[in-house]
């Protein structure tokens, strides 16, 4: 009986070990990147997964040094023996860009009119709100009313006037999905016009930080996150946009629960670049303007590690300065939040309290290479924030160049 119980315990222990091992391998499979970049002659190493290497017996560990530029399948294994995941290794020349850290102004016009508020219309029958009655919500983007394409606020007004109180079809976009509804404008005697009871916005403006410029392609990358509407938080759907010169004139320091902000103003209405993409990973566009900065290599995503680094930020005037930070965490799981950063530089902490709005796009450098850009501040701890890989931003910038050629 005693022996049978012992055997049962051993079996249960083995089952638990197998389950734990399977869970660990599953976690590792998801944690490993599905694709990595290497330059010719570079050994395939994953500093964040030191115990993982290419499966032995199936090609050289130095994948790049024995092969030409191209794409290859590589099986990664624990200790080189236990296969975990097959990934794609892209062998390419290491890119070099002009790292900036300078402020720029943004002027954008949206694709459609964004609903940013509602207000009842006083009619002879009492307060009414046709927009709400039609089911419209904050953040909806109205792209057509009747036969009128609503590219701006004036077009919305003209379409409502043309309806003359009759029901009209409204085409709008919500969460990326195009929808239709029917709306009946009402007469506002106080303003002598037909109204829908909604406030709309067709443009946006602000200040951000330029991460880098690729002079060879004639493209720029900045912010590290999309330009969003200040009232709804919705990303602005780009119809057209440009960047202009800007200088920082002041700063409100951040505190726990209250993010700070850089204050600036446009120096000129003359555009120095055209925005082509307002995406989840930043603002990208084309430019023929010479931007000041330093030529630096871009670190591939797997080369970014925890430890000391620096950001280039402009908190006064137009000239950036380097400030010390610590990269506390690196992950491939969320393409918009690859790093968690902590400001350690006393000078920056004294002036801004850490990371503030307007610093988004500030370049992050480690071991002399551009590894990423600041994207967001942690609201409850302004000394800490998020960052995105520079490799991701470069891929988006290259897409902006293709968009320009297609146009």
Predicted stretch roles:
Residues 182-357, 366-367, 375, 381-396, ...:
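Serine endopeptidase catalytic core focused on the charge-relay Asp
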Residues 105, 109-133:
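PDZ/PDZ-like groove recognition
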Residues 8-28:
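Hydrophobic membrane-insertion alpha-helices, especially the h-region
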Residues 38-51, 138-139, 305, 360, ...:
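Short, flexible surface segments
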Residues 131-154, 364-367, 371-376:
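Conserved PDZ fold ligand-binding element
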Residues 63-67, 144-177, 381-383, 388-391:
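PDZ domains, with a preference for the canonical peptide-binding region formed by the helix
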Residues 2-3, 56-99, 276-323:
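Interdomain regulatory linker/hinge segments that flank or connect interaction modules
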């Amino acid at each position: 009986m005693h022996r049978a119980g012992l055997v049962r315990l051993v079996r249960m222990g083995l089952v638990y070990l197998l389950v734990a091992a399977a869970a660990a391998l599953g976690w590792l499979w998801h944690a490993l990147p599905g694709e990595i970049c290497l330059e010719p002659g570079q050994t395939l190493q994953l500093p964040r997964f030191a115990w993982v290497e290419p499966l032995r017996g199936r090609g050289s560990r130095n994948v790049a040094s024995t092969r030409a530029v191209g794409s290859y399948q590589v099986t990664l294994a624990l200790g080189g023996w236990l296969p975990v995941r097959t990934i794609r290794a892209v062998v390419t020349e290491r890119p070099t860009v002009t790292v900036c850290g300078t402020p720029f102004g943004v002027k954008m016009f949206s694709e459609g009119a964004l609903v940013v508020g509602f207000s009842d219309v006083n009619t002879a029958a009492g307060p009414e709100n046709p927009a709400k009655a039609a089911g419209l919500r904050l953040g909806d983007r109205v792209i057509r009313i009747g036969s009128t394409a609503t590219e701006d606020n004036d077009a919305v007004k003209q379409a409502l006037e043309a309806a003359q109180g009759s029901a009209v079809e409204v085409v709008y976009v919500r969460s990326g999905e195009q929808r239709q509804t029917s709306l009946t404008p009402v007469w506002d005697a106080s303003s002598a016009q037909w109204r829908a009871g909604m406030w709309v916005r067709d443009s946006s403006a602000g200040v951000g930080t330029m991460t880098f410029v690729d002079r060879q392609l004639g493209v720029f990358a900045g912010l590290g996150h999309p330009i969003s509407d200040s009232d709804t938080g919705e990303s602005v759907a780009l119809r057209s946009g440009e960047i202009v010169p800007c200088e920082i004139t002041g700063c409100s320091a951040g505190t726990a629960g209250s993010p700070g902000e850089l204050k600036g103003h446009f120096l000129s209405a003359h555009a120095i670049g055209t925005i082509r993409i307002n995406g989840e990973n930043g603002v990208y566009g084309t430019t023929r303007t010479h931007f000041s900065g330093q030529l630096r290599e871009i670190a591939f995503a797997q080369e970014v590690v925890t430890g000391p680094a620096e950001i280039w930020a402009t908190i006064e005037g137009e000239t950036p300065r380097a400030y010390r930070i610590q990269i506390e965490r690196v992950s491939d799981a969320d393409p918009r939040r690859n790093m968690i950063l902590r400001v350690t530089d006393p000078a920056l902490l004294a002036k801004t309290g850490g990371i503030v709005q307007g610093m988004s796009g500030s370049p992050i450098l480690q071991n002399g290479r551009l590894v990423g850009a600041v994207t967001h501040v942690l609201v409850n701890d302004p000394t800490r924030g998020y960052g995105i890989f520079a490799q991701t931003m470069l891929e988006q910038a290259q897409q902006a160049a293709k968009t320009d050629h297609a146009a």
